[in-house]
């Protein structure tokens, strides 16, 4: 199929993903702050029992504790281990939770045994917003990002028909060099560059384009189906 507009290709891919099990409600133009709140909401829903969050939502500083743990993970392997680790610990500082205030609790983040079932959530982010690290650069906006239980794990850049897929990958490389994939976005495990007739998959921080199929270790067989 020919797409003369990148936006049409983007909408078509969203439609395919939705048909394959990704949530139909698309998160549009979300910033890192928005995505953190989305993740906090999912963590709350999956951990609201008395032994965990005791039906009291996570505070901003509790989410910051999780971010700080992520920022200590310097390699893709360790970041992948975080995603697959099934749980993360925080010290409760929500004063409303008198049962756990000041105590360490463990939160369920993801269980790959629950793929397409249980408490798993699979969301699409359209045109996510990335703040740049330099005042000399404008903030960036990606094409698509895929979230599993609120965690960004796949980033997709698209080009319309007639534009080489290498240009989409070069865009990802540019974002990487600008430090876009840090903070919450450092959890991204797979980059996907696409034009309507060709797709390139690459693990994070690989500096060359390799057209090799990748089975994502968190349990997805492909980005198109759950």
Predicted regions and their residues:
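An alpha-helical interface "stripe"
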Residues: 1-226
């Amino acid at each position: 199929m020919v797409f003369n507009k990148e936006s049409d290709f983007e909408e078509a891919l969203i439609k395919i993903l939705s048909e394959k099990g990704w949530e139909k409600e698309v998160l549009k133009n979300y910033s890192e702050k928005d995505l953190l709140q989305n993740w906090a909401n999912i963590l709350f829903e999956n951990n609201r029992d008395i032994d965990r969050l005791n039906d009291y939502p996570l505070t901003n500083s509790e989410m910051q504790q999780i971010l700080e743990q992520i920022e200590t993970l310097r390699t893709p392997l360790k970041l992948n281990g975080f995603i697959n680790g099934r749980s993360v610990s925080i010290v409760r500082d929500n004063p409303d939770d008198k049962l756990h205030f000041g105590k360490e609790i463990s939160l369920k983040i993801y269980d790959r045994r629950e793929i397409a079932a249980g408490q798993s959530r699979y969301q699409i982010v359209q045109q996510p917003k990335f703040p740049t690290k330099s005042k000399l650069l404008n903030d960036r906006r990606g094409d698509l990002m895929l979230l599993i239980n609120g965690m960004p794990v796949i980033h997709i850049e698209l080009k319309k028909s007639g534009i080489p897929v290498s240009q989409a990958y070069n865009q990802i490389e540019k974002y990487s060099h600008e430090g876009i994939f840090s903070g919450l976005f450092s959890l991204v495990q797979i980059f996907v560059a696409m034009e309507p007739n060709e797709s390139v998959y690459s693990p994070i921080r690989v500096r060359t384009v390799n057209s090799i199929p990748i089975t994502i270790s968190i349990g997805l067989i492909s980005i198109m189906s759950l």
